[in-house]
């Protein structure tokens, strides 16, 4: 049996939109499960026949429709496309991107509000209570605790950016490893090339593969000649957006902020 009625969206849930097609209850349950689990999905409706199908990110789809789906996953925009001689409505469902910043430092003070304005759900984590104060991070989701204690309850995922800026391996290394295992879309770490070389040694000893380590953007940020904490924050945010919208090997792109 098919669910009577079209795909109707309420105002309080802007992630759904109406196409007028009938939706199979099984697809609806699958879509709701994907949204609950923060997985990317596109509901495809054939505008000629009204048939629906759900495609998860990574599912193989051939032809022009597959290319259109790939672009829609990157842009996050729903809309009508013509592919393979037919017209389809692509209803895109992407989890809200998150940014977890490890370290309540000056760079973080600039980065957190800018990232929030860009659309990221931002969290700053630092066990050092002298740094992690509400006075320094007014209006920011701030956790004065060890990253492993916080992130075990709120795991990282593929729609999370991890930015490690404490310069302290006791604080940075665990979330970096967790972000790589979770396939976070962006993993960046502050530090010079010498600092990163020592980091690579530690992560290798911890069992992280060279391929995984190569995903770390270090030194962090696009190479815009940044000097001040605010400028470095701009470079980090730009590199994060690049990784979100153009998911290539950002860490191997050679686009860095500095060696500091």
Per-segment meaning from a language model:
Residues 6-143, 157-160, 195, 241-260:
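Segments forming oxygen-rich coordination pockets for charged ligands
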Residues 190-260:
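Adenosine-phosphate binding glycine-rich loop
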Residues 171-184:
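Rossmann-fold NAD(P) dinucleotide-binding segment
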Residues 2-3:
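Compositionally biased, low-complexity intrinsically disordered regions
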Residues 166-169:
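N-terminal glycine-rich "phosphate-gripper" loop used for MgATP/nucleotide binding
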Residues 148-157:
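Short amphipathic alpha-helix with an adjacent loop that forms part of the alpha/beta core around
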